[in-house]
Amino acid sequence: MGQRYNSNFLRIAFAFVSMLLVYYIAAQIVAAATIFEVLLGLNYQHGILASVAVIALYITMGGSHADIMTDGIQGIMMVLIALLIGVIFFMGVGFEGTGPSMINNALVIQDPSLGWDNYLKEGDILFGSFWLISLIFVAHIPFAMNPHIGKLAFALKDPKQIRTFLLIAIPVGSILGFTVLGGLHARALFGDVIRPDQAIPVLFTQLFPPFIAGLLGVGVLSAIMSTSDGLFISIAVIFSNDLYKKTFAPVIHKSKSKEQIEQIALNISRVAIVLVGVVACWLAWNPPQFLAVLLWMGVGGILAGATGPLLIGSLWRRATKTGAIASFLVGVISFAVGIVYCFVLKEVPFKNPFAVAGSCIIAAAITMVIVSLMTKPLPKQHVDDMFGESA
């Protein structure tokens, strides 16, 4: 971001905002601990410690190379699990009868508003109106701007591979959406007596023999690992590269050699991984009812700040430095105010991080366009270099 707009402020500010990824990591740790709790019978807090230890050791020893090389294998396991969830859902496994209609009937008996013909649930903070549902979609538009996702593009050896990447990623991403059906299936079978985030592991343990359920649990852990390792690496890079190498080293370590700076950066990244693990543990110790709430309290702030400078700036050549800074500030500050209002003030019943994020993303996008049109554009040569069109 700093290079796109020749702005040290944007590079440093976005680096600090990206530390909100610790909430994302906390959500992944909660998910892993839940798997250990349901499948292995571990105490939830012990599961948290085990999850952090395994992930941190894995990343510290392997780094980005291990992250990228193993994500492909873990991704295959995730796709297989998602397909299995889809199959047992459409077969209506666990019910007397065949087909997804069995699941729908069970849901309607529990609560008529859960039926598939109901799109809105009056009074619900997430699905109470068409506008609230729309904000969920808006909040996800810039999701690829998350640092741990965007960095994957740098693993491509040739920009021409982006086409192949998209041809694979789009259908695979669609298949992974089948996992949502596991939540419906579990609710239909077990009612609301289980914690929502336990739905899929409980579904596996009840429908399959222990050995098979264990293997399926490994698939779910693969999904958690493939996300968590990237998150840890992203935050480590923020500390070691964005803050130290690009910002502070040129000022405080002018006399040090390139090799010395690289070694210091490596040590900083390893320390950062440990610190992030400790903070994530603390956040995960007493999680909210839904993981999505914990996750979006962090992700929403990052996306609100990235929408203008990164998303619009990567598509629109006319984006300006002033517009990017204004958009970043509007997005981040409005998100912070919204989160404090909705989640810190106890008397406020409206606790919807998607609505807060979606609204702030819209505000940031509008700010980016208006301010950019009113301010001086960046030099043409610089823009050509950024878009790969220089002579």
Write out the residue ranges for each language-model feature.
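Membrane-embedded helix-loop-helix hairpins and adjacent transmembrane boundary segments
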Residues: 2-391
